[in-house]
Swiss-Prot record:
Belongs to the major facilitator superfamily. It is found in: Cell membrane. Gene3D superfamilies: MFS general substrate transporter like domains. It is a multi-pass membrane protein. This is Uncharacterized MFS-type transporter YtbD. One of its GO terms (cellular component) is plasma membrane. InterPro entries: MFS (IPR011701), MFS_dom (IPR020846), MFS_Efflux_Transporters (IPR050189), MFS_trans_sf (IPR036259). It comes from Bacillus subtilis (strain 168). The keyword Membrane applies. Keywords: Cell membrane, Membrane, Transmembrane, Transmembrane helix, Transport. Disulfide bonds: none annotated.
Amino acid sequence: MTSANKSNIPALLALAVSAFAIGTTEFISVGLLPLIADDLDIPVTTAGLTVSLYALGVTFGAPILTSLTSSMSRKTLLLWIMFIFIAGNTMAATASSIGILLAARVISAFSHGVFMSIGSTIAADIVPEDKRASAISIMFTGLTVATVTGVPFGTFIGQQFGWRFAFMVIIAVGIIAFITNGILVPSKLRKGTKTTMRDQLKLVTNSRLLLLFVITALGYGGTFVVFTYLSPLLQEVTGFKAGTVAVILLGYGIAIAIGNMIGGKLSNRNPIAALFYMFIVQAIVLFVLTFTAPYQAAGLITILCMGLLAFMNVPGLQVYVVMLAERFVPSAVDVASAMNIAAFNAGIALGSYLGGVITDSIGLIHTAWIGGLMVVGAVILTGWSRLMEKRDRQEA
């Protein structure tokens, strides 16, 4: 592991640029659902599959493809990832039916899963151990900046020029990310380690890692019960106009970026303890939103608080999975990171699916407290994991 110095920063920034491109394409559908539904003449909940199937593509693609590409040069793999990303979004921009659009989203999702897994391990590997969460948070800043600017700007572009043009802009960002990776990411990165079936079996049967994957899915996915349908909630429940929603999404994204950086700082030394308290506050905010959503001022404040907490847990979850993998399955750290990325997206898929079911059955307002229940599950399991961590320290 190299020491932290200024030469690490360009590589981290290159990863952040790629994360920005990928983050924009992941979440842009949230703001474009009504436009996609109108253009393809489908229900908005069917258009919502562009979010949930993307998440499923990451869920299944991340561990499988990361394992298959484990012996490749990290830089070569990064460039191939961005090439596939560009191809998938080109297919989406030219899709003539929902079937083609969903297939394009899954292709893009495959690049997402591999990038986020190896990106996290590269970021963690090029800094000292006590700076790992901060390094990962720098990489994930690209993802949060995508939510700050990419999603609201993409929503605005879609409203002005059509949803297809929004995807064309993403293609341009992907090309920039490809060039940035080629120039700034050093060739002399830690080589991938070929993971054996025995290592993978050991990984998927390790109770501590499996527990963390469930925590990730519940804690991260709870917010997406609400977030996937945030645009219609803001319009139909809170009473904001469509043009105002893009501005609110910008504020939501700024809150996410701030929360991500705070989460990285809080998680540097004791990530599991930090996660426990983050999830408690996150659950409370989601429950409160159930009561404040019908009121514009109170609802807006609560939604911004939800944004502050939405990604705050990401650096801690990723650094903790690396810590556990190095302890229990050191030859499969990349695959463990990929499986946690899969868990993030399993949470998104579950959350967005539940959001659609709830919206169709009992109404948008109920997405908040049901999302809160998911996060309560993460609180309970994080508390359990925290107790086991304390026991390990006592036995050491």
